[in-house]
């Protein structure tokens, strides 16, 4: 662990392998924290190694795509508002990604295509990325459906579950009437807002990190970012009055 922190010089992500929802993951800033978090993980017998990854500060982005073994269909790119290291299920997600360059979007589309082909995916694939400036890094690749599939399907109008099912039984993306690649962005903003149940769980740690804590989500759609965000907050019952803001 000390060697890892020396190599990376900054924060690292300490995590067990093969977990869902970011269970047991922690961001460590020094050797003492690394040792503490590894001891916590080791309280439960581990069949797989504990991983120590470099922590990058950047913009987190995500795609759900369908691959037929040759071509890939990417309905859109989602951008997370929260800092990197916050679990994707706890992040506010914005479609289309609105603060990254065309180069970053094209790089994400190309990486998605190459990874799906290299993994021989026929069906759904979910990939999470970090953009640090114009550099794009892969966080993780999941050759399966993800919790963002209903969201991206609804806001783009592309039935990716239906398409993936057809692809699995032998159809191609072109045969299903779609052009491969990253699809044209919508002219509206769609924001997915996580919903938490902290008020029902006394003593729960409410700070956000790699381990997922949300229990639901809602959606705000509008022509502008501010209006979509307002609707999403309204759906999550997280609105504040002007009096509360003054306090």
Which residues make up each language-model segment?
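Conserved small/polar residues in nucleotide/adenosyl-binding loops
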Residues: 3-11, 240-247
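ATP-dependent carboxylate activation and anion-phosphoryl transfer catalytic cores
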Residues: 10, 20-23, 27-242
């Amino acid at each position: 662990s000390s060697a890892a922190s020396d190599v990376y010089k900054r924060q690292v992500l300490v995590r067990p392998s093969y977990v869902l929802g970011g269970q047991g993951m922690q961001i460590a800033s020094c050797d003492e924290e690394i040792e503490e978090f590894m001891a916590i993980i080791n309280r439960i017998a581990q069949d797989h190694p504990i991983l120590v990854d470099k922590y990058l500060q950047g913009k987190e982005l995500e795609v759900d795509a369908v691959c037929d073994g040759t071509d890939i269909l990417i309905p859109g790119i989602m951008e997370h508002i929260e800092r990197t290291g916050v679990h994707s299920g706890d992040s506010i997600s914005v479609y289309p990604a609105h603060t990254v360059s065309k180069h970053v979007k094209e790089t994400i589309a190309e990486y998605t295509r190459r990874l799906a082909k290299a993994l021989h995916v026929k069906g759904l694939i979910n990939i999470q990325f970090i953009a640090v400036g114009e550099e794009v890094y892969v966080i993780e690749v999941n050759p399966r459906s993800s919790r963002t599939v209903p969201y991206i399907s609804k806001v783009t109008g592309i039935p990716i579950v239906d398409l993936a099912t057809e692809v699995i039984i032998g159809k191609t993306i072109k045969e299903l009437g779609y052009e491969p690649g990253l699809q044209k962005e919508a002219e509206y903003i769609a924001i997915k807002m996580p919903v938490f149940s902290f008020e029902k769980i006394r003593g729960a740690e409410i700070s956000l990190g790699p381990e997922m804590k949300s229990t639901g989500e809602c959606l705000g759609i509008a022509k502008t970012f501010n209006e979509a965000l307002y609707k999403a907050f309204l759906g999550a019952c997280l609105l504040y009055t002007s009096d509360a803001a003054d306090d």
